[in-house]
From Swiss-Prot:
Alphabetical list of SUPFAM superfamilies matching this protein: GroEL apical domain-like (SSF52029), GroEL equatorial domain-like (SSF48592), GroEL-intermediate domain like (SSF54849)
Coiled coil: none
UniProt-recorded name of the protein: Chaperonin GroEL
Lineage start: Bacteria, Pseudomonadati, Pseudomonadota, Gammaproteobacteria, Enterobacterales
Enzyme class of the recorded protein, top EC level: isomerase
Any one GO BP annotation for this protein: protein refolding
Record's keyword terms, sorted: ATP-binding, Chaperone, Cytoplasm, Isomerase, Nucleotide-binding
Amino acid sequence: MAAKDVKFGNDARVKMLRGVNVLADAVKVTLGPKGRNVVLDKSFGAPVITKDGVSVAREIELEDKFENMGAQMVKEVASKANDSAGDGTTTATVLAQSIVNEGLKAVAAGMNPMDLKRGIDKAVVAAVEELKKLSVPCSDPKAIAQVGTISANSDETVGKLIAQAMDKVGKEGVITVEEGSGLQDELDVVEGMQFDRGYLSPYFVNKPESGTVELEHPFILLADKKISNIREMLPILESVAKAGKPLLIIAEDVEGEALATLVVNNMRGIVKVTAVKAPGFGDRRKAMLQDIAVLTAGTVISEEIGLELEKATLEDMGQAKRVVITKDATTIIDGVGNKSAINSRVAQINQQRDEATSDYDREKLQERVAKLAGGVAVIKVGAATEVEMKEKKARVEDALHATRAAVEEGVVAGGGVALIRVANAIRNLCGDNEDQNVGIKVARRAMEAPLRQIMANAGEEPSVIANNVRSGEGNTGYNAATEKYGNMIELGILDPTKVTRSALQYAASIAGLMITTECMVTELPKEDKPDLGNAGAGGNMGGMM
């Protein structure tokens, strides 16, 4: 076991504080409408330019191990805020830095660290309650666009795109961000249910100019099995041919003579038919087939529940207004499924998502909800260079997370105003003793830090603006972009309540732990000893002669 280096008391806290300040100072230059960029060097490729707090925090490793421990703990604040709300990482870092700096001053003055922490925790619990009272629901597209604009560093086109995407696919819909091919940002919406399986044979194509299959008002056969024997299919093919409608077969696989016969029938025009593989694998495939069945009012033909393909009738078929199939995707548009059945299926999947333990499972379940409930929107980010593309894509993703958080828990006045109002609302809060009261003051003072930092980045005098905002009422604040006072909600300067709440809670949690630290232990750096192996070998050879 390697030898350890141990530091106690003030020595440990001074080192830790230095690390906290190095990381926080690098992150906080990005805060606000006039925040600056940070350039990150990469071991390969071009440097990355970013205004995203968590991206900056993740890059920082300090040489001194004690300082690095302080930096890593603040990095945890940014990461937690990012994981919880998807934004607010810089605000969380600024709050944590302020609480740690003020808290350690109080500890140096002889306050009890445990009581300080209890006071800070008490203040944060009260502040979160006040924050909820200030929160305003965010549901109309204009407010959603404003939240997206603020989070994307005042980029209005991004805010509008996100609002359009949410309007198209609904609150439960999946919105993804991809790199586009042009200079302009684009929104691509896939309505209906789409899954990544294409036609099994190019001979099914009926729109050769686009290389797609388009079926109008088709019957949809869902089978949880491989189909290789055409005899099983004959009764249903005859029924579909008599009905004069096209048929889409979604099965585990269609192969051999079954596929060949379907292709021949399709080419001769006897029955218009297309076959695709079912999406997913194993249990997920069964679940997705059931989703399609609910969407199209069909039944999954599965031997597990005693249904056989030979005995299937038209009543077992699903139906949709239109189906479009490319070589690698199938889209079912306007399934005839019962709305209440679809809603109960969505509720069931939502419950599974809430109970899921892995992020991957949660993501897949959310995708299934989106496909049933609305659709999928893709925001394609346009930029002139790869460096700009990466920076812009990160901003759009942040803005998307912020708007989701806003829809979930509502919005409060932005620009650091909400935290100042909250700090004022809890001014009469008292602890059990004087040390706890100091902890409450530390937390209240920290709540001014985001506004002060926004002003410092804008080149204003933080103390003057903070005093003016503090003496104001309601949502009155200072717009650093236009350098004017006004009602932040009316000006469209909004912060999602969830983002502000998460930033405050995580900052206080980790800063409280740092204030109560009395000892730090790290490994001593190893000294690389010169390799004397070759010299020894030469000496031995000399002895042998």
